[in-house]
């Protein structure tokens, strides 16, 4: 791999890799996808490998220091700037000229939607950019609702999908008024949040006011600095400088198991989906770390209805609660971007990434005969006993890690070493103590 800094016009290019990825589907023409991320999450590298193995040429827009810039299955990377994200997007798209754009986090998905909105259709270049975004993500008229939790819940109800009633609130009076109707426990959520952040479960009236204050102060300087030091993440600084206050909503708490669906879709039709039940996660509302592949007709039907009414394309995900009384699936969140289980094989032996790649290639999706769905709990990358032998993951035997990818093994090891640094542990300990005092 040639790992040097080059400049192509106004684009900051992080690396160029001329080595062909191993284990990919051979073809004389491989559609190109531009994978974009605002964060240094190792899961994005796992997604890149799956896209490459499905027969796609993968380029990436990512922050400096991301593992995407040094793996052989990503052919080229461009520098993402947290303080000028739209310029980063526009320049990388122009330089890459991809067949499809795949956002891997809510931040870049929202920025793509904003770029579409702010780009005037006045010339051929602008028209091409807008067409590519719409081609990659689906009907642009629905973009504004993607980040409104109350809006998505209302749309779900209209489509006949079970979902807790979600109401926007703006002050303490509205908060306590809604609590009188909903009862306890209740869930407060902020629009635009993801990964379990911006969510608070409140059990008593005494917890309500501090939780409301914490979520409305989501973009304070202290939080931005904490994210920069702990996670090397500068993405909160721009909202902090803009003094952005998120819209809050409230819904009743649903008792049951968490589940989600990773989906590939095209112009409002589902190509493939994989449904999983969450066995373990980072904190109560955080991303799943251990899942089990399941077949759930209620989830599958809900996904088909939502994809159709939103007229979606590309990769996306839906989060559900499986009711503890009857197992029915209730929608609690929508993720307008690729999610971390989209490379898994479903109970029907379909795979979202493979199906999307086949659609781009104009071929039917073909799953290798020797592959079969996991029968038990799967520890998702980058977690697992090989990297954290003393953790609770040691009791699981199924690990989401290709045996022929030493690059991903190295990335996972680096992730756990970084997570266990003394300074990071100290900040997280202080953060937990502060949260306990606030809530």
Regions found by a protein language model. Name each.
Residues 35-46:
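A short, glycine/small-residue-rich beta-strand->loop->alpha-helix junction that serves as a flexible
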Residues 60-72:
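Short, glycine/polar-rich helix-capping loops at beta-to-alpha or helix-loop-helix junctions
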Residues 70-170, 176-177, 194:
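Conserved N-proximal alpha/beta basic substrate-recognition cap immediately N-terminal to
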Residues 164-166, 186-231, 258-260, 280-292:
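Glycine-rich phosphate-binding loop of ATP-grasp-fold ATP-dependent ligases
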Residues 213, 219-281, 294-299, 322, ...:
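Phosphate-binding site of ATP-dependent enzymes
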Residues 244-247, 284-326:
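A long amphipathic alpha-helix within ATP-dependent nucleotide-binding catalytic cores
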Residues 337-353:
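ATP-dependent carboxylate-activation loops
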Residues 354-439:
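Peripheral (often C-terminal) accessory segments that flank ATP-dependent C-N-forming ligase machineries
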């Amino acid at each position: 791999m040639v790992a040097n800094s080059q400049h192509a016009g106004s684009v900051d290019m992080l690396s160029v890799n001329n080595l062909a990825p191993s284990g990919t589907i051979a073809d004389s023409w491989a559609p190109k996808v531009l994978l974009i991320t605002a964060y240094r999450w190792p899961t994005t590298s796992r997604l890149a490998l799956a896209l490459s193995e499905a027969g796609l040429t993968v380029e990436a827009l990512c922050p400096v220091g991301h593992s995407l810039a040094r793996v052989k299955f990503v052919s080229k990377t461009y520098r993402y700037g947290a303080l000028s994200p739209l310029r980063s997007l526009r320049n990388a798209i122009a330089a890459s000229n991809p067949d499809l754009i795949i956002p891997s986090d809510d931040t870049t998905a929202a920025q793509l939607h904003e770029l579409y909105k702010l780009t005037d259709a006045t010339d051929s270049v602008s028209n091409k950019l807008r067409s590519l975004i719409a081609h990659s993500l689906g009907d642009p008229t629905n973009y504004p609702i993607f980040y409104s939790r109350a809006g998505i819940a209302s749309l779900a109800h209209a489509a006949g999908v079970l979902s807790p009633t979600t109401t926007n609130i703006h002050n303490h009076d509205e908060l306590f008024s809604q609590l009188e109707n909903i009862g306890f426990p209740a869930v407060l959520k902020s629009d635009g949040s993801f990964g379990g952040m911006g969510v608070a479960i409140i059990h008593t009236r005494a917890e309500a006011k501090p939780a409301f204050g914490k979520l409305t102060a989501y973009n304070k300087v202290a939080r931005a600095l904490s994210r920069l030091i702990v996670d090397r993440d500068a993405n909160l600084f721009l909202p902090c400088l803009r003094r952005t206050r998120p819209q809050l909503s409230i819904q009743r708490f649903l008792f049951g198991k968490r589940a989600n669906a990773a989906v590939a879709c095209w112009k409002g039709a589902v190509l493939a989906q994989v449904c999983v039940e969450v066995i373990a996660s980072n904190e109560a509302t955080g991303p799943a770390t251990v899942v089990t592949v399941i077949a759930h007709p209620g989830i599958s039907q809900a996904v088909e209805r939502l994809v159709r009414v939103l007229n979606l394309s590309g990769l996306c995900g839906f989060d559900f609660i499986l009711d503890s009384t009857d197992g029915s699936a209730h929608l609690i969140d929508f993720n307008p971007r690729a999610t971390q289980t989209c490379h898994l094989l479903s109970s029907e032996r379909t795979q979202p990434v493979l199906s999307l790649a086949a659609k781009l290639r104009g071929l039917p999706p073909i799953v290798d005969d020797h592959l079969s769905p996991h029968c038990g709990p799967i520890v998702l990358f980058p977690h697992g006993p090989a990297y954290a032998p003393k953790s609770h993951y040691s009791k699981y035997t199924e690990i989401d890690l290709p045996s022929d990818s030493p690059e991903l093994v190295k990335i996972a090891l680096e992730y756990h070493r970084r997570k266990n640094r003394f300074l990071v542990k100290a900040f997280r300990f202080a953060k937990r103590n502060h949260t306990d005092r606030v809530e």
